[in-house]
Design a protein with these regions (language model features):
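C-terminal domain-tail junction helix/linker
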Residues: 153-157, 179-238
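Short small-residue beta-strand/loop micro-motif enriched in glycine and branched aliphatics
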Residues: 101-105, 159-162, 186-187
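Basic, flexible linker segments flanking DNA-binding modules
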Residues: 1-69, 219-229
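An active-site-proximal beta-strand-loop segment
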Residues: 63-103, 109-110
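Conserved, non-catalytic sequence blocks in retroelement Pol enzymes and Pol-derived host proteins
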Residues: 15-17, 64, 84, 139, ...
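RNase H-like two-metal-ion nuclease catalytic core shared by retroviral integrases
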Residues: 45-48, 137-139, 145-149, 159-181, ...
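Active-site beta-loop-alpha junctions of metal-dependent nucleic acid enzymes
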Residues: 87, 105-128, 144
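Mobile genetic element proteins and their domesticated derivatives, centered on retroelements
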Residues: 6, 25, 59, 78, ...
Length: 238
């Protein structure tokens, strides 16, 4: 977790037993080598050389750009490799663009669409509204596939995709990947089963305990639940 967020959490404890300045906390963490180094390793997971249709980018800045003003208007999706002690697993994430909540995830043994679509289906099962929803991703084979697109069609979800190789066109999804891998998934799981347990715990902590600067130090679940108290319907079609 970042120093500013840790500073906020420490200074908002109910018992008020600790009061420390941000700079002092930063220096203290550095002195004891507790600052988490940012990892820059990059592994390509996107295969955009395929025959399937690529949807236009609805989130690209222009006069008709779509902006998420409340939860469950825009979801962003991405896939990242998860190193194991022997080999790798693949983590698929679906995140709400407004609340920053991870609404669906799945750890699979490979990049097959059957694994990636499980995160999307999980997110849809948990959804409690029926308003218009955009699913935004890169133009990788998995997201463009007949299987993945059929879930869009059955549930009335609008599809949006990046229009090139610019990672900034799916920056939020990339950012969530980085948070999980740099703050939570610091050690290599022994195998796929352990990876799934660690990711499950990490997602729960991220959603329910980690404050976000963009959310005025609220957690993603705080923002999402405040929205859900107003709207509670789900018509998911598998």
């Amino acid at each position: 977790i970042g120093t500013r967020k840790l500073h906020y959490l420490l200074n908002t404890q109910a018992d008020k037993t600790l009061n420390i300045g941000r700079d002092r906390l930063f220096n203290l963490l550095g002195e004891y080598r507790l600052l988490v180094p940012v990892k820059r390793a990059y592994h390509k997971t996107t295969n955009s050389h395929h025959r399937f249709y690529r949807h236009p980018n609805l989130l690209k800045p222009d006069p008709e750009q779509v902006t998420a003003l409340e939860p469950e208007q825009v979801w962003v999706a991405d896939i990242t490799y998860l190193p194991l002690r022997s080999g790798t697993a693949c983590l698929s994430l679906v995140t709400d663009a407004c609340s920053r909540k991870i609404v669906g995830y799945h750890v699979g043994e490979n990049l097959q669409t059957e694994n990636v679509v499980k995160a999307f289906r999980q997110a849809l099962r948990r959804r409690k509204t029926t308003g218009p929803l955009i699913h935004h991703s890169d133009r990788g084979l998995q997201y463009c596939s007949v299987l993945y697109q059929s879930v869009h069609e059955r549930n009335g979800i609008t599809c949006s995709m990046t229009d090139g190789y610019d990672c900034y066109q799916n920056a939020l999804a990339e950012r969530i990947n980085g948070i999980l891998k740099n703050e939570f998934l610091l050690s290599r799981p022994a195998d796929l089963e352990q990876a799934r347990e660690i990711v499950k715990e990490s997602v729960a902590i991220y959603n329910h305990e980690r404050p976000h600067l963009a959310l005025k130090y609220k957690t993603p679940d705080d923002v999402h639940q405040a929205f859900y108290r107003q709207k509670t319907v789900n018509l998911y079609q598998d």
